[in-house]
Curated annotation (Swiss-Prot):
One of its GO terms (cellular component) is extracellular region. The CRN proteins have modular architectures that include a signal peptide, a conserved N-terminus, and highly diverse C-terminal domains. The conserved CRN N-terminus harbors a distinct LXLFLAK motif, which is followed by the conserved DWL domain. A highly conserved HVLVXXP motif marks the end of the CRN N-terminal domains and forms a junction where diverse C-terminal domains are fused. The conserved CRN N-terminus mediates the translocation into the plant host cells. InterPro entries: Crinkler_effector (IPR052980), Crinkler_N (IPR045379), P-loop_NTPase (IPR027417). Residues 55-136 are annotated as: DWL domain. It comes from the Eukaryota. Belongs to the Crinkler effector family. Its main location: secreted. Residues 1-17 form the signal peptide. This is Crinkler effector protein 15. It is found in: Secreted; Host nucleus. It comes from Phytophthora infestans (Potato late blight agent). Residues 18-54 are annotated as: LQLFLAK domain.
Length: 615
């Protein structure tokens, strides 16, 4: 008599002992397992699949693999294989009902036949040690209950899959943070899929269904090109490894995994076939409205939809009960992109600059790299109105040619657990180009954002750049401004406001390479390059200027040297400040520079924002 500890794969807290004689058949063990779990498993005992829980061994690369006994190898007869310790990582996850790569590997082989004796199974065929305490001995895989579906139906709905990419999913293994395929992924044309940490988090929550017997809906959305379709392949792989039924709606066709075999679906089964259409079936839909797919009875099965933020794909589906869980795919970090960049050697010299300009979107950074990133942003700015450029993208957004283009500029940002999001611009460069291109023709509306952008985070993000343009215009025109001298924090009393007259520039602002002695007095100069680090503008014999939109603005390196070249009364620095920061702005280091705060009031507010931008 031996005592075996068995565990049902995928069921938390399901480890249990079974006492049985080693001379009995595997079929007898199945009956004993069913007797111990009458409430968990209601099918026939013969349908249970049993696998040995072997302790892993390390291969040459250090990866844990399942040991395989070869009776012909003399060295294998000298030492028995060990059982899985109950403190091993895989065992701990097993008893918690979670999946694990090594558990998948143990259950990926052929289950033992019920006609074999336990002695033959354990010792003759696998050379296992004698079972003892603090071990897991047998893994039990319970087939899908109440959903026995024929693989190839009598009316020819299904056929055997011959697509090499989809055919390989059952045998694909996770290697580190990668899935390694023998065929190219249709979307990336690569043989590896990088598993982002966000993929795992989103999939865990999206596939979790606490209401057994009820359908589960989930929506995964995000910026175009961020990898939602690749994520669908990751979810497909996970469900297949867990031997779940999956129906994939893909551009290459309809693919169905019945729990053991990958098939191609030539026509959907009848919507009245409740044996097929049941909550345990996961339908994976990419960029299509599930409610409008002919023949899909979406109310009878679980559905995961991946789509860009668009009402025509998500809106109607989101209305259906039970309400879908919505997840927002995050932008890629620079570190994540660096991980996959070696797969795109043609982008090696440009991808980091493209990331700085276009944000964390792999399609734009690594794949579609023919167009210069600044030219791409300029084209988007020119094609879209200001209202388009401050449109709050959401799952209820209407999609047209302009909204597709504007999503080059506007991205969806999300953080774990990826249930909430905010809209952000692709980069600082994107914001600069929006303001620069709209300043000529939409100046009044841009200026109106300075005082009326509350509630629109995109408009608020632009305000700093708008203020720079607006302040430069005011500076060029000259006039009387409220100002105050800045002193160190040790001074107890803040000096009262006064007024200062800034002379009107004798000519329109002049572009200069740098500050030089002898430049014309009462002439406003600006640097010719955006990376000039000293001061933003200067007027000989008056002083230098910094456009400032925050409390923490510091004096740039080289400013003191530039100010010294501005002649009599020129060795002073003026910070041009919006009303929000004028009163609280303090003197900056180096404090040897004479510093002043100038109040630049916002223009009179006229609310010219269209209602659509605030929806």
């Amino acid at each position: 008599m031996v005592k075996l500890v068995c565990a049902i794969v995928g069921v938390a807290g399901s480890a249990f002992p079974v006492d049985i004689d080693a001379s009995q058949l595997v079929g007898d063990l199945k009956k004993a397992i069913k007797a111990e779990n009458a409430m968990t498993f209601t099918g026939d005992a013969k349908d249970l699949q049993l696998f040995l829980a072997k302790q892993p061994v390390d291969d040459e690369s250090g990866k844990e693999v399942v040991p395989v006994y070869r009776p012909s190898a003399e060295e294998m007869k000298e030492e028995s294989f060990k059982w899985l310790p109950d403190e091993h990582r895989a065992a701990l996850k097993l008893v918690e009902g979670e999946s694990d790569d090594y558990i998948h590997a143990l259950t990926a082989g052929e289950p033992i036949l019920g006609s074999k004796t336990l002695t033959t199974w354990f010792y003759t065929k696998n050379n296992m040690e004698l079972p003892s305490s603090e071990q897991i001995h047998v893994l039990v895989v319970v087939p899908e209950q109440g959903s026995s579906v024929p693989t190839v139906s009598q009316d020819g709905v299904f056929d055997h899959c011959i697509n090499p990419f989809f055919l390989q999913f059952r045998t694909v293994d996770k290697v580190g943070d990668w899935l390694e395929f023998s065929s190219l992924l249709p979307l990336t044309r690569r043989q590896k899929l990088y598993i982002r940490s966000s993929y795992q988090v989103i999939a865990n929550h999206a596939l979790f269904n606490p209401n057994v017997g009820m359908v589960k809906y989930a929506v995964v959305t995000g910026t175009p090109g961020v990898g939602k379709s690749v994520f669908v392949y990751y979810v497909l792989w996970r469900l297949i490894k867990e031997k779940k039924r999956v129906l994939l709606f893909d551009n290459n066709g309809l693919f169905y995994f019945d729990g053991s075999t990958m098939l191609i679906c030539l026509a959907l089964p009848s919507k009245f076939n409740e044996q097929f259409w049941s909550p345990d079936l996961w339908c994976l839909v990419d960029s299509m409205d599930p409610t409008s797919i002919p023949g899909l009875p979406y109310r009878l099965c679980s559905v995961l939809l991946a789509s860009t933020p668009r009402r025509d794909c998500i809106g109607e589906f989101k209305k259906q009960p039970p309400t879908a869980d919505v997840f927002y795919m995050p932008l890629w970090s620079k570190e994540e992109l660096a991980t996959i960049a070696p797969m795109y050697p043609h982008a090696a010299a440009v991808w980091e600059n493209r990331f700085d300009c276009l944000g964390g979107v792999p399609r734009l950074v690594l794949q579609d790299i023919e167009t210069d990133p600044q030219a791409l942003l300029m084209s988007a700015c020119s094609s879209c109105s200001l209202d388009d450029c401050i449109m709050l993208v959401s799952i209820y957004s209407e999609i047209n040619s302009k909204t597709k283009i504007v999503q080059t500029l506007i991205h969806i940002h999300s953080q774990e657990p990826y249930r909430k999001y905010k809209v952000v611009y692709a980069s600082d460069l994107a914001m600069q180009l929006i303001v620069r291109t709209k300043w000529r023709f939409d100046r009044a509306k841009l200026q109106s954002l300075l005082g009326s952008s509350d509630g629109n985070p995109l408009a608020q993000s632009l305000c700093g750049y708008i203020f720079e343009f607006y302040s430069m215009d005011r500076l060029e025109q000259g006039g009387t401004f409220v100002y105050r001298e800045l002193f160190s924090g040790k001074r107890k009393r803040t000096p009262a406001d006064g007024t200062i007259d800034i002379p009107r520039s004798s000519q329109p602002r002049q572009v200069a390479e740098r500050v030089e002695v002898g430049q014309h007095a009462k002439q406003l100069y600006v640097p010719g390059t955006s990376n000039y680090t000293a001061i933003d503008a200067w007027m000989p014999q008056f002083g230098g200027f910094q456009m400032t939109v925050g409390k923490t603005h510091d004096i740039k390196g080289g400013a003191a040297d530039d100010l010294a070249k501005l002649g009599q009364n020129g060795n002073r620095l003026f910070f041009l400040l919006p009303p929000l920061y004028y009163k609280t702005f303090t003197k900056k280091t180096p404090q040897t520079i004479k510093q002043y705060a100038i109040l630049v009031p916002y223009p009179e507010v006229r609310n010219e924002l269209s209602a659509s931008t605030l929806q």
